[in-house]
Amino acid sequence: MATDAAEKANILAEALPYIREFAGKTIVIKYGGNAMTDDALKEGFAKDVVLLKLVGMNPVVVHGGGPQINDLLARVGKQGEFIQGMRVTDAETMEVVEMVLGGLVNKEIVSLINKHGGKAVGLTGKDGHFIRARKLFLKTDGDEDVDIGQVGEIEAIDPALVSLLDSQDFIPVVAPIGVGVDGEAYNINADLVAGKLAETLRAEKLVLMTNTPGVLDKQGQLLTGLTAQRIDELFADGTISGGMLPKISSALDAARNGVNSVHVIDGRVKHALLLEILTAAGVGTMIRA
């Protein structure tokens, strides 16, 4: 018992330099994957976020919800379709996306954080029009436009609402839904929202939680550190593809635009968030410009 207590005290003491370094800093966290579907991991994530807030950091959560969207689409007889890692979103699918992301998933995360002593507030980009978007067209190899429905790209993010919540000790929980000039809702990739929000808020860190140990090479080995040049090479040779494309593109843009460090971590590891931010070892892949 005494040994266990001493070990816990040592862990807290080792975290002190990181707590001091990041006090008052903004940490944007993209929350997704298995960490959102496993009950123990969900509880652990909520506790981690509350702890970061209590020790003086400003965590901002941006969440996905792909599996939950797929489940509801299946229940209404629709099958999800993806092109270049982006969900094709017709009007009916957009209704499901708003119900799942802005309602079910967002409110569950808010409730879990509040259950563990935080003060979380759920938002979509339609609140205060703080995520302004326009219709996204993908490009074919022949440079032709591909219409994927109500999928948006970010025009601008107004940081005032999130900054206000941070300053009043609330924890913003953001669903990746943007709004056009005509009030049209747009489904936006959550990794892109997290990256652009981190840039706009001048965040110290952007943490992207995934279902892999981090960025892997073609042999399945973890790449613990990546530069912009190396990422360009991995794009070119196809090592980074599919759903990882928007994730790593967002990470690289954030690193190039003022976010001090970006981390792609394994959300299947309990307390991965604390391991990354409050220990020397860290986990996953660190990306710098």
Curated annotation (Swiss-Prot):
Q: Which NCBIfam families match?
A: argB
Q: What does this protein do?
A: Catalyzes the ATP-dependent phosphorylation of N-acetyl-L-glutamate.
Q: Which gene encodes it?
A: argB
- What is the name of the protein in this document? Acetylglutamate kinase
Q: Name one GO cellular component term.
A: cytoplasm
Q: Per the UniProt entry, what is one GO biological process? A: arginine biosynthetic process via ornithine
Q: Where is this site: Transition state stabilizer?
A: 30, 247
Look up the EC number in the record and give it.
2.7.2.8
Instruction: Identify the species of origin.
Output: Chromobacterium violaceum (strain ATCC 12472 / DSM 30191 / JCM 1249 / CCUG 213 / NBRC 12614 / NCIMB 9131 / NCTC 9757 / MK)
